[in-house]
Each structure stands twice: as structure tokens, then as C-alpha cells.
UniProtKB/Swiss-Prot annotation:
Protein name: Transcriptional repressor NF-X1
InterPro entries: NFX1_fam, R3H_dom, R3H_dom_sf, R3H_NF-X1, Znf_NFX1, Znf_PHD-finger, Znf_RING
Basic and acidic residues composition bias: residue spans: 146-159, 188-202, 222-252, 280-289, 306-319
Region (Interaction with PABPC1 and PABC4): 9-26
Modified residues (Phosphoserine): 50, 82, 95, 129, 150, 324
Zn-finger region bounds: RING-type: 355-406
Higher taxonomy: Eukaryota, Metazoa, Chordata, Craniata, Vertebrata
Gene from which this protein is expressed: NFX1
Family: Belongs to the NFX1 family.
């Protein structure tokens, strides 16, 4: 961050002191007599996002606030009376004006006096002809030239930091001056008055003021500025340690964050703010020093830029529509919605924050709980329910998960506490943040090395970074820098590290850095201990292993001459000195096999050894030293007598295993040195390779990971190339091939420039398709890469395939249109017409007509109904046409097949002929023409039964009593069964269901007849097919309309009754079935039997039917 010029006489806050406590409640009235002295430490300890002290009071001008804070550093006893009086009058005047008390009489008097002073100052300005003259006036009053205090040219240019790494630009900046108001690079603000003032119609809003332009009507404020500057400069010389309120550590806004605005400033233009360029953030290594008054992340703004224009302040005081902030804590409430905390406060205060569990708004009086990980706010009851629900349980952990950040908590919250956790069940106050206690937060920064606590009032969201500063040593420990407390970044200076490296000889030449230094990079040449090998290594390698001659071991035999002068060192390359000769007499104490001490052999008469060249005496026992052959269970030993030197070859055999240990074989020990100790068996490995596609199939395999050596070879997504990697599991990678030709769309308007990855589809084009189409209709689809264009959807008129009608609104791409009507074309047989729906092509094709023949039969007149046989005669078949037969009285009706009816007539005719035999035997003639004509065959009738006879008797009885047939005295019409036989059969299976249906239908018919509506419907519940069929059949009897809806198994029936059409039958179906189920009475017994005259015709008696006795046949 670019450093502003240090303020002379600035002081530094002690953050560890007891007074470093943020003010909990700001005094709302600066004009109160008991609270006139402001504590500058409290002003400085406000939060980074709190407004500066110049904003805390109700629109007090910057001049008055500056005066207030200049006097606030004196003790109460040492403050000059003149300053106290000035402070009281200034604060009182401003505070009263800000509260809108201009209408009071005493206030009007003060306004008039002030107006007189303004006119006098205006006259003083009129006397000055130019800017130098005005400058001389200020110089004469203050005794100091204004230009002498301007900073250097290097300090005037403050470069704005570009976050994208662009070259910094020189921006026009406000520079430090002791005058009132900003000064732009060498020009005083008083010189701005000579510029052209914009026209009123071209000016901005009322409160908007262009940067660097002063209106003519603000000259009175300029004059007062010139007069008052001398006194202020003298005050500054007397008290150099005082700081302005906007320089207080806690009162400056943080860079990158917009400070909260007052209500009166929200409608003003930001032109004055735009003139201040951003202060770039420099690296800590490049900054030479840090000002004691700089707070690290707080922008340093000049005093002149902090002071408001008197004219603007006056306009705001006189504007009745500008709302001022209420007094109390709400003035300092965090309102920056760009931060997490500011957004939470804004939403909770306005009751626009929603609970993530119930999706309801969080009210200011509702108990809440805030997650300490993500800082989301929930209703307390909602988070309790969530924590106890199975969905909140953490996998593999004991606890419950936060609905927002999934952070696992061990305990379920049961109490309603404020955000800082100090107060339970906090009461809501209109002047405080909802759900907060109003006290200082004092929470520690988690995970940071910061001893300070949060100095904000109790707030939601994360605590801001610690505003305190601390002195931190750089990594090399040579320089000190002032950094933010708890800042995790390390401090680096621009000096070399100069620490001793790992070699202990050289120093680190890198710049100040963190962590251990890199190993020494100097290359040295080292020699092994035996001097036969050398190597080049980095300095510091194998430190402490040097023996003065060599630095490492080369793993070769040493070979140096021993002290005995007869033997050489047989050890591996080692540091000096070599071990003494192992054959010296004082070192050899046992025989060569090691079983017998030499002292015993000397006692037995063996000669003693004097030099290393003398042989070692043998004990004469078996050597017994272990040999390298054999197995773990049985170790072979040397079978020779005690001897010097190596043992000879073993004369035994050893068992060795193959590589995979699947098979073994036996070999002589003498051949183990010439042959390999292992062999390969012929077993093939059947395990799958890592690719999962192939088997290993290796002979005597010993691999743990069976890698597949084959190439994958599968086609890639591009469809052009194959995978060239070793065979693997899963999907292949994308094709790495690329084309260096341009890939264009079909029309060439859109282009993808090379390199083009293989498999890339042509680019999408927004141009209209330019291909040649089959039709001449307008084209509405875009350019495409498919070979075939999408179908044309232009609506046209087309004939159907059978040329029956001209169809409209048919899309152009549809070719074969069917109208849905029967074809009706005459078939090749000439007798039938095509019954297919409107179709394409020929009606029959290779097939023949199979429709039934319509030629009438000769015997019955019904159609032939045989498959179409063209010109061939009709085949002789039985007629299967259905006809209706009736009895003589017409009561009985039955539908029968024509062939069955003719056979019945023949049976009746045979019976009639048998009854005429007697007449033929007597010589009488018999009329048989009626029995064999076709007319009689068509007039075949059924036989009357007992009911027909009963009905006939009732008719005669009615005629005898002269009863009219219209009255239906015997209920003949209603007794005629309206229920079909199939309905009766179905109803017998479930009489209770039929009874319930009849009751519903009767109630429906009565309701529609009595009600106002002409139609009324009833919906039956879903039922099976048999029950639905019963309802349909009964609906016909009752005159109801029945329709089935839905699909199985939810298919049901809805019946509708229509007034005048629906009627209840006189006899219900259940009544008819109950009557039929009753036992029938036996027929009447005949008193005499009629016999024929010829008793000899026994066959005729068997054929003839017994006559029915008619008791009502009365002869007149």
C-alpha cells in the first residue's frame, strides 16, 4: 500500500492499555454541558466499518468537529478557557442548527449575527483583486507561507494500484496543506474561483458539486476560511501531538470497503470522492518505514479532504427533506452490506433474513441460533428439530451437521443467547442490532496469534481483523516492521540472509526468506577412503565422515598393506586406520574350525606360532562349519577335518523350489554354483491382469501386480483413432490428436481456428441454412452440420391418399396423409369394396378378396357368407344366419341359427305326418304341401308352454268379464321379463350386490324426478368387469345412461338419470329371481285320458304329445 506523508506530531495508540476499549454507546448530544469533553481514544477505537467522527454528530461541519477533537486531548484542568469557550459555542451552535431549531427567536438572532459576519468577510474578498493577494492575506495572518508546507513532488504523486497488474497511472491527488479544503497539485482552493462556473441547466443535482469547481455564492465560506486558517495554524504549532478525528486509528475506513453513509449524504454526488486516487498496496519488503499513525489497512486521507464544503453543509442543514440519524447505538451499527457481517445486520434489522430450515423470515423477537462456522442464523426451535432428525446425523461421527456448512457439532443448542454468548435471552432494542446484547463482543480471533479481542459491539457474522499493530521481525532477524496483529504473512526485508549453510563453511546468498536455507550448491570433488574412486558432490554431503584422506566408502576391498607387512586389508573400503592382521599370534586363540583352544593344543605338544605367517595348528576334528547349500530345516556342514581356508564342495543333494514355489526338485550341491538355485515350472498363471480384460498366462509367474503389456486399442470418443495406451480399466482418455485446419460450419460463417482437438463438432452458426431444399417454402432453421435438413413445417393443403378430401394445415414434410375414412374402392372381384381405412397403394396387393359372399341362398334366402369365390358357384354349406322364432301366441321369442330352425321344423313336420297316418290308412287324402314349402319353413314357430296357456286363459277370462286390455288387469305387460337371461345368470352369483345397485338406481331416478335439475349422475366405485357389466345391463332397464371411465384396475362406471326418460321397473331383478327360485306347484291331474280309436297304433301314441287340460274352456 502506498504510504501517505507522515503527519507531523502523530502519536501511536497503545493497544494493550486498559483504555483501549471501544465505546459502547456514543453520546448523542455533543451540546450537553456534562458531556462536552470527547474522549479521543474512544473515537479512535470504533470499528473499522463505523463512520468517522465527523459523521457521528448530526451533520456537524468538519470545521467544528475538528475544533472539538483538537481540544479533546487536553486534561480538563489544563485546557485554556478560550478554547473551552470556543468549543462550547461551536458545538452548541452546530448542534442546535442540526436539530432544526432555526425558527426559535434566539436562534434567528444568532443567524442574523452570523449573516453580518459573512458580509464582512465577503467585503474582504472583494477587496482582493487576485489569488496572490489572497495568499498574502493568509500569510500575513498566519505568519507562514502556505506553499512552504507543501510536500515534495514525489509525495504529491500517489499511484493507484491496478489489481490486474496494469501499469500504474498518475492520478490527481489532494496534498497536505494547512489551509481549509483540498489543494490540487500546486493550486490553492482559493484559486479555483477564477474558473468558469457551469450553467444552472447543465449542473447536476442540488447536492452535487463538481470536483475542483467553486460556485460564486460560496465566496463567503472561502473568506471565512482565510480568516480562520491563521488561528488554526498557530494552534497546531503549539500542540504538535494532536491528531484530527479522521486520523484516529479506529475512525478511518478500510481500503476496499465503502464506509457507511449518513442519511444526509446518500443523495450527494461522489465527485469529491472520485478525485482521491486509491492508495496502492506495496510489498512489505519494499517499504522503508511505516508511520506511527498508519493502521495498515486504513486509508490515510488528508485533513483538507475530510473537511466538508461550508456551502454544502449549509444546504444540508436547511434541507427539510434530509433525514438525520437518530441518536444512540444505531448510529454506529454496521451497515456495510458488502461484508458478511453488514449483510446479516441489514437483513436481520429489516426482517428479510430467512431461516434455512423452515424458509420463514427471522423476526427480531424470535429466539435464534448462529453457527460459529458459517455464521448462518436459524430459528432456535428449527435448529433443535434439525439436530434431532436422522437427516442431520454425521456419517461416522457423533454429532449433528449444520444445514448450511455441514460442520459437525457435538451438543444440541437449548438456550437462546446473543451472538457473543455472554447474555441469555437478550431483549430486543430498537437502537441495537437484533438478537445482540449491546455490549462489546470481546471474542478472540480463531486460529490467529492475536492477544486482542473483538472491539465491536455484539454482532452476527465473523469478527473483523484485529485493527491493532505490532512490531514484527523479518525472517532474517535484522529489521523490524510494523504489521497488523494476527497477520499470517511473514515479513521479508531486502537484505541477504547470510546464515551459515549446512556445510558450515559458506553463507546463504538469498534474500531474506522463511524456513531453512537451501543446501549449499558449491560442487566439491571427494575421494574414497581407499583412494581408488572419486566423485563430484555438493558441499556439505557426508559431513563428519572424512578421515583426513577420504570422505566416503566405495564398497570395494580396501587392499591396503597391514602393519604386519605380509597381508593386505580384506575389509570393504573404510576410514583409516585398518584393523590389525587377523593372523597375528596374539589374536588367533582357536584352531581353524574354532572348536579347540590353541592352549590345549600346545599342551598336547603342538608348536607355538611366532608370526602371522606360521600355520594355525589343527585339532583333527571334523570341521562342521555350515555350508551355503541345504535348506532351512536341514543345514549342510563341512565333513572335512579341521583345516584352514575355504571348505570344499558339499557331496550331498539339496531340494530347490521353482520361482512361484509351486514345484520342487532335487539337485547335487556341487551343481548349485554352476546352475541357478531356482528353476521355472510349467504352470501358467490364470489371474486377471490389472486391465480386467486379459489373463496373465505367464509361466511360473511371480508378479504381485499383473500389469497388462498389451495396447488398449479401443476406439476413442472421436471415432477415428484408437487408444494407444497400455490396456487399462475404465474409460479411455480423450483423443490427443489435433487438426491444424480450420473447422467451419456448412456455410463457412463460423470458424474454429487451429489447433482443433479431434472429435470437435463444427461450430454453431446463427445464419439461415443455405442448402438447396426440396420445397420452395421459406427456411426458418439455422445452419447445421447434419447431412439432412430438419423437416419443413410450413402448413399446406394436401389430398389424402385415397383422394377422399383435401386436408388443410398439413406440414410440408408429411407425404402420405390419411383422412381416416374407409377406402370404399371396388375390389377386383367386382362384388365387394375395400374396407380398410384410407391407405396408400393397392387395396389387396398380392392377396385375394376374403370378404363373405353376399349371394342369396336358394332355400332360405340368407347370404352365402362363404369367402369370396368370384365366378365359382356358392358352396353347399349350412346357413349360420341368426333368426328370431316365436310361438303361436307371440309370447316366446328365441334367436336361433337358421340351420337349427329348419331341423326343428322338419321334426315338427314329421310329427304332424305321423298324426295323419291313420287318415291315410283309411284312404283319406292328406295335404302335405304346407309341410314342405319354403314359406312354411320360414314360418317355423316355437311351441307354446304353460305360461302361454295361462296367458290365453287370462285373456278369455277378461273377455268374459268385459275387461279392457288397455288396463292390463293381469299385469301382462309388466310381467314380461325385461331382464335378459345373461343378466339373471350374473345376478344369481351376487344377489346382495345387485340389490345395492338397484337401490342406488331407484334413489337416483327418484332424485332426478323430484329435483330441479334435468340430469343427475352417480359414480360407482372401481370394480371388476362382471360387476360393471351388471350395472350396464341394469342401466338399460332403468333407462339410465352408463359410461365407464379410467383404466384397470381403477375402472368405474358412472350412470346418469334423465328426467322423462329414466323410470323404475315395476318388478326388480331381485324380485324376479326370488319368484323363480320358489318351488313351482305341480300341474293339475287329468280326470280322464283320451285314447285313439285304433288302439293298435302304439308308436303314434308315444310320439303324440299329451294334450293340455284347459279348465276355462267353457262351451256356450
Amino acid at each position: 500500500m502506498a504510504e501517505a506523508p507522515p503527519v507531523s506530531g502523530a502519536f501511536k495508540f497503545n493497544t494493550d492499555a486498559a483504555e483501549f476499549i471501544p465505546q459502547e454507546r456514543k453520546n448523542s448530544g455533543l451540546y450537553c454541558g456534562s458531556q462536552r469533553r470527547l474522549d479521543s481514544n474512544r473515537i479512535g477505537r470504533r470499528n473499522y466499518s463505523s463512520p468517522p467522527p465527523c459523521h457521528l454528530s448530526r451533520q456537524i461541519s468538519y470545521d467544528d468537529i475538528s475544533a472539538v477533537h483538537q481540544h479533546s486531548f487536553y486534561p480538563s484542568g489544563s485546557k485554556p478557557k478560550s478554547q473551552q469557550t470556543s468549543f462550547q459555542s461551536s458545538v452548541t451552535n452546530k448542534s442546535l442548527k442540526n436539530h432544526g431549531l432555526q425558527n426559535q427567536p434566539w436562534q434567528k438572532l444568532r443567524s442574523e449575527k452570523q449573516h453580518i459576519r459573512v458580509k464582512r468577510a465577503q467585503g474582504l474578498i472583494d477587496q482582493t483583486s487576485d489569488a496572490p493577494g489572497l495568499e498574502n492575506v493568509a500569510k500575513s495572518e498566519s505568519g507562514t507561507n502556505l506553499r512552504e508546507h507543501s510536500p515534495s513532488e514525489s509525495e504529491k504523486e500517489i499511484v493507484g494500484a491496478d489489481p490486474r497488474g496494469a501499469k500504474p497511472k498518475k492520478a490527481t491527488q489532494f496534498i497536505y496543506s494547512y489551509g481549509r479544503g483540498p489543494k490540487v497539485k500546486g493550486k490553492l482552493k482559493s484559486e479555483w474561483g477564477h474558473r468558469m462556473t457551469p450553467k444552472p441547466e447543465e449542473a447536476g443535482p442540488e447536492n452535487t458539486k463538481p470536483a475542483g469547481v467553486i460556485h460564486p455564492d460560496s465566496s463567503d465560506a472561502s473568506s471565512r476560511k482565510v480568516v480562520a486558517d491563521g488561528a488554526r495554524r498557530g494552534e497546531q504549532r503549539r500542540h504538535p501531538q494532536k491528531r484530527s478525528p479522521w486520523e484516529v486509528e479506529g475512525a478511518r475506513p478500510r481500503p476496499g470497503r465503502n464506509p457507511p453513509k449518513q442519511e444526509g449524504q446518500r443523495h450527494t454526488n461522489a465527485g469529491s470522492r472520485d478525485n482521491m486516487a486509491s492508495i496502492p498496496k506495496d510489498d512489505l519488503n519494499e517499504r522503508p518505514a511505516k508511520s506511527t499513525c498508519d493502521s495498515g489497512n486504513l486509508a490515510v486521507v488528508s485533513r483538507s479532504s475530510r473537511r466538508a464544503d461550508p456551502e454544502k453543509c449549509a444546504v444540508r442543514r436547511q434541507d427539510p427533506q434530509v433525514a438525520s440519524f437518530p441518536r444512540g447505538k444505531q448510529n454506529h451499527m454496521l451497515k456495510n452490506v458488502e461484508t458478511h457481517t453488514g449483510s446479516l445486520i441489514e437483513q436481520l434489522t429489516t426482517e428479510k433474513y430467512e431461516c434455512m430450515v423452515c424458509c420463514e423470515l427471522v423476526r427480531v423477537t424470535a429466539p435464534v441460533w448462529s453457527c460459529q462456522s458459517c455464521y448462518h442464523v436459524f430459528h432456535l426451535n428449527c435448529i433443535k428439530k434439525w439436530a434431532r432428525s436422522p437427516a442431520s446425523q454425521a456419517d461416522g461421527q457423533s454429532g449433528w451437521r449444520c444445514p448450511a456448512c455441514q460442520n459437525v457439532s457435538a451438543h444440541v443448542p437449548n438456550t437462546y443467547t446473543c451472538f457473543c454468548g455472554k447474555v441469555k435471552n437478550p431483549e430486543w432494542s430498537r437502537n441495537e442490532i437484533p438478537h445482540s446484547c449491546g455490549e462489546v463482543c470481546r471474542r478472540k480471533q480463531p486460529g490467529q496469534d492475536c492477544p486482542h479481542s473483538c472491539n465491536l459491539l455484539c454482532h452476527p457474522g465473523p469478527c473483523p481483523p484485529c485493527p491493532a499493530f505490532m512490531t514484527k521481525t523479518c525472517e532474517c532477524g535484522r529489521t523490524r516492521h510494523t504489521v497488523r496483529c494476527g497477520q499470517a504473512v511473514s515479513v521479508h526485508c531486502s537484505n541477504p540472509c547470510d546464515n551459515i549453510l549446512n556445510c558450515g563453511q559458506h553463507h546463504c546468498a538469498e534474500l531474506c526468506h522463511g524456513g531453512p536455507c537451501q543446501p549449499c550448491r558449491v560442487i566439491l570433488n571427494q575421494v574414497c577412503y581407499c583412494g581408488s574412486t572419486s566423485r563430484d558432490v555438493l558441499c556439505g554431503t557426508d559431513i563428519g565422515k572424512s578421515d583426513g584422506f577420504g570422505d566416503f566408502g566405495c564398497l570395494k576391498i580396501c587392499g591396503k598393506d597391514l602393519k604386519c607387512g605380509n597381508h593386505t586389508c580384506s575389509q570393504v573400503c573404510h576410514p583409516q586406520p585398518c584393523q590389525p592382521c587377523p593372523r597375528l599370534p596374539q589374536l588367533v586363540r582357536y584352531c581353524p574350525c574354532g572348536q579347540t583352544p590353541l592352549s590345549q593344543l600346545l599342551e598336547l605338544g603342538s608348536s607355538g606360532r611366532k608370526t602371522c605367517m606360521d600355520p594355525v595348528p589343527s585339532c583333527g576334528k571334523v570341521c562342521g562349519k555350515p555350508l551355503p547349500c541345504g535348506s532351512l530345516d536341514f543345514i549342510h556342514t563341512c565333513e572335512k577335518l579341521c583345516h584352514e581356508g575355504d571348505c570344499g564342495p558339499c557331496s550331498r543333494t539339496s531340494v530347490i523350489s521353482c520361482r512361484c514355489s509351486f514345484r520342487t526338485k532335487e539337485l547335487p550341491c556341487t551343481s548349485l554354483k554352476s546352475e541357478d538355485a531356482t528353476f521355472m515350472c510349467d504352470k501358467r498363471c490364470n489371474k486377471k491382469r490389472l486391465c480386467g480384460r486379459h489373463k496373465c498366462n505367464e509361466i511360473c509367474c511371480v508378479d504381485k501386480e499383473h500389469k497388462c503389456p498389451l495396447i488398449c486399442g479401443r476406439k476413442l470418443r472421436c471415432g477415428l483413432h484408437r487408444c494407444e495406451e497400455p490396456c487399462h480399466r475404465g474409460n479411455c482418455q480423450t483423443c490427443w490428436q489435433a487438426s491444424f485446419d480450420e473447422l467451419t460450419c456448412h456455410c463457412g460463417a463460423s470458424v474454429i481456428y487451429p489447433p482443433v482437438p479431434c472429435g470437435t463438432r463444427p461450430p454453431e452458426c446463427t445464419q439461415t441454412c443455405a442448402r438447396v431444399h426440396e420445397c420452395d417454402h421459406p427456411v426458418y432453421h439455422s445452419c447445421h452440420s447434419e447431412d439432412k435438413c430438419p423437416p419443413c413445417t410450413f402448413l399446406t393443403q394436401k389430398w389424402c391418399m385415397g383422394k377422399h378430401e383435401l386436408r388443410s394445415n398439413i406440414p410440408c414434410h408429411l407425404v402420405d396423409i390419411s383422412c381416416g375414412l374407409p377406402c370404399g374402392a371396388t375390389l377386383p372381384c367386382g362384388m365387394h369394396k375395400c374396407q380398410r381405412l384410407c391407405h396408400k397403394g393397392e387395396c389387396l396387393g398380392d392377396e385375394i378378396c376374403k370378404q363373405p359372399c353376399t349371394t342369396s341362398r336358394a332355400n332360405c334366402g340368407h347370404p352365402c357368407m362363404a369367402p369370396c369365390h368370384l365366378s365359382l358357384p356358392c358352396p353347399v354349406t349350412t346357413c349360420k344366419a341368426k333368426i328370431e322364432l316365436q310361438c303361436e301366441c307371440g309370447r316366446r321369442k328365441e334367436i336361433m341359427v337358421c340351420s337349427e330352425a329348419s331341423s326343428t321344423y322338419q321334426r315338427i313336420a314329421a310329427i304332424s305326418m305321423a298324426s295323419k297316418i291313420t287318415d291315410m290308412q283309411l284312404g283319406d287324402s292328406v295335404e302335405i304341401s304346407k309341410l314342405i314349402t319354403k314359406k312354411e319353413i320360414h314360418q317355423a314357430r316355437l311351441e307354446c308352454d304353460e305360461e302361454c296357456s295361462a296367458l290365453e286363459r287370462k285373456k278369455r277370462l277378461a273377455e268374459a268379464f268385459h275387461i279392457s286390455d288397455d288396463s292390463d288387469p293381469f299385469n301382462v305387460r309388466s310381467s314380461g321379463s325385461k331382464f335378459s337371461d345373461s343378466l339373471k345368470e350374473d345376478a344369481r352369483k351376487d344377489l346382495r350386490f345387485v340389490s345395492d345397485i338397484e337401490k342406488e338406481m331407484e334413489a337416483l331416478v327418484e332424485a332426478v324426478n323430484k329435483g330441479k335439475s334435468s340430469k343427475k349422475s352417480h359414480c360407482f366405485p372401481p370394480m371388476n368387469r362382471d360387476h360393471r357389466r351388471i350395472i350396464h345391463d341394469l342401466a338399460q332397464v332403468y333407462g339410465l345412461e352408463s359410461v365407464s371411465y379410467d383404466s384397470e384396475p381403477k375402472r368405474n362406471v358412472v350412470v346418469t338419470a334423465v328426467r322423462g326418460k329414466s323410470i323404475c321397473p315395476s318388478t326388480t331383478l331381485t324380485g324376479v329371481l326370488e319368484k323363480e327360485n320358489q318351488s313351482r306347484p305341480p300341474p293339475p291331474i287329468a280326470h280322464h285320458r283320451q285314447t285313439d280309436k285304433n288302439p293298435g297304433s302304439s308308436n303314434l301314441q308315444k310320439i303324440a304329445k299329451e294334450p293340455v287340460i284347459d279348465y276355462f274352456d267353457v262351451q256356450d
